[in-house]
């Protein structure tokens, strides 16, 4: 059991924990669909969310590549809502989505207030499986980067959560021991169990 009096550093996941990925993704898809003149049914996001989560779990287990994830999550969603679209258009949507996602930077309600409270008491850090450049822009454009001493992503660490290597990389970067650290995230397996395996 962790003795919270000994905690000096708090590590956060970014997407779905601080950064409201679902809201920002919906706004981005709406923009992309409009730009491409696609009349996609309004239930797209309802089906995209669980499909996206499924593929992120496979990516974390190294069963698929990030490139495959970007295509498959869209292809499966379009099939689920019975919307006909070519593979070429799916690839274009996937590319435009990544390019435009950081135009929207909503965080969860209360996130800034919590970080303001914590920043004077602890060293704060990010551990994310998201792509380096995209995550960097999310932090910058949402004005979150001011709160974090270090940012570890899977590209830098050479491993994705729940792999112990990404947590060890983050701890080394922060120069802190596991017993003085706390991990906060939305995914029990990737964030919490992964951190407990250190």
What name fits each language-model region?
Residues 2-5, 120-122, 173-180:
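Glycine-rich phosphate-binding loop signature in dinucleotide/nucleotide-binding domains
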Residues 4-109:
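N-terminal helical cap/lid subdomain that shapes the substrate entry/recognition surface
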Residues 86, 146-150, 177-182:
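Short acidic capping loops at alpha-helix termini that bridge into adjacent secondary structure
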Residues 92-96, 100-106, 111-142, 148-154, ...:
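Substrate-recognition element of Asp-dependent hydrolases with the DxDx(T/V) motif
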Residues 160-192:
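Conserved Lys-Pro-Asp/Glu-containing loop-to-beta segment of HAD-superfamily phosphomonoesterases
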Residues 197-198:
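Structural motif
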């Amino acid at each position: 059991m962790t003795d919270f009096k000994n905690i000096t550093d708090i590590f956060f996941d970014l997407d779905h924990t601080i950064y409201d990925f679902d809201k920002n993704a919906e706004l981005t898809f709406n923009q992309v669909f409009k730009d491409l003149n696609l009349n996609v049914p309004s239930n797209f996001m309802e089906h995209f969310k669980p499909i996206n989560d499924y593929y992120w779990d496979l990516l974390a287990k190294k069963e698929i590549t990030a490139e495959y994830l970007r295509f498959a999550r869209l292809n499966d969603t379009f099939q689920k809502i019975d919307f006909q679209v070519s593979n070429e258009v799916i690839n274009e949507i996937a590319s435009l989505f990544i390019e435009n996602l950081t135009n929207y930077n909503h965080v969860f309600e209360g996130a800034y207030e919590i970080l303001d409270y914590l920043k004077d008491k602890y060293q704060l850090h990010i551990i994310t499986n998201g792509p380096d450049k995209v995550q960097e822009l999310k932090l910058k454009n949402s004005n979150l980067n001011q709160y974090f001493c270090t940012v570890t992503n899977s590209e830098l660490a050479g491993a994705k959560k729940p792999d112990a290597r990404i947590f060890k990389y983050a701890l080394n970067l922060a120069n802190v021991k596991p017993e003085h650290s706390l991990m906060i995230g939305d995914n029990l397996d990737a964030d919490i169990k992964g951190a407990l395996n250190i």
